[in-house]
Amino acid sequence: MHIAYLFIGLLLVFSCLILWYQYHASTRLLLGTTYNHYRSVVSETANEMEQAYHSGSLLVELLANQRNDMATQPLADRLQHLPFYVTALRNSPKLAALYTGYDNGTFFLVRRYIPSAEMIRQFDPPAGTAWMVQSQTLNGDGKITGSYLFYNDKLTLLEQRGVAAYRFDPRMRNWYQMASDPGMLHSTSPYRFASGGLLGITLAARMVNAPGVAGSDIQLNGLDAMLQAARITPNSHLVLLNAQGQILASDLGLPGLLTNSLGIVHLPTLADTDNPQLLPLAQLSRMPPLQPVSLDLANGERWEGMPFTFKVLGEKRCAC
């Protein structure tokens, strides 16, 4: 009888060991598969951002090398070049706007109209608007005057509006100041565009034949949808950060903007978020890349994660 009990006990111990081994083996296999999946997500995200960059770089370089100088041209002369701008934007869906700013403070921009509450609030465009022109020119007194023009998809003018309050000095912008040498293409870090609030980057190059800078705004929209589609389980989360640790996108959608004590609007960091689903990722963002990390939270939950980093346009980005 004792031998039978001993035999049964040994079987139970052996069964427990087998179950324990299988559990840990399956856990390692699952984690390994998950990490490989997210490596693919990081690669896809990096490729998406690279493609966005290349879609605008050629157009900026072409614009920077044109012989046309619109710095002192009246609006009517500038509008002769509208078909070029619109054709360029039509063939580059990721481009939100194409523009030139000049050393005398004048400015000419053509953008595709993407309906949003913010765009309607800022511009109140007429029905049927497909393209918008924002222009600042010098009048006869040497003062800068602003205008908004709204066109339909066939480039028929719907409305021209003089805007006395429109004051946009391109010389004060980061993209203008960094483009100091002709022949060099420069890129900003991702940020929210002042018009429309879209997430994107700006490419800029000093013009060769005019005293100014050519630039383009490139949208990075769709990154949040990409991260949402990449989730393996309902409780898995992904966040894309820039080199400053600010949230560019997450599987929970685009983050809201914050305003600091100086009145400067900025993207939030993980430390700024009050979303409990993203808080565990704040610890991951401080860990060495490509190292699996186990996080034991105060509420008893255990999270497994891994930070990944990749470079786009010479800047380090981090995806968790």
Task: State where each predicted segment sits.
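Extreme N-terminal signal-anchor transmembrane helix of membrane signaling/transducer proteins, especially
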Residues: 1-28, 32
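Alpha-helical transmembrane helix bundles of large polytopic membrane transport and channel proteins
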Residues: 97-158
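Extracellular/periplasmic ligand-binding regions of membrane signal-transduction receptors
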Residues: 43, 50-83, 99-117, 154-164, ...
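Extracytoplasmic/periplasmic ligand-binding sensor regions of membrane-associated signaling proteins
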Residues: 137-221, 296
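Solvent-exposed, extracytoplasmic
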Residues: 79-92, 178, 182, 192, ...
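Short extracytoplasmic/periplasmic juxtamembrane "stem" segments immediately C-terminal to an N-terminal membrane anchor
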Residues: 32-51
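Generic short beta-strand
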Residues: 98, 135, 148, 238-239, ...
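Extracellular/periplasmic juxtamembrane segments that couple receptor/chemosensory ectodomains to their
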Residues: 198, 204-212, 216-218, 223, ...
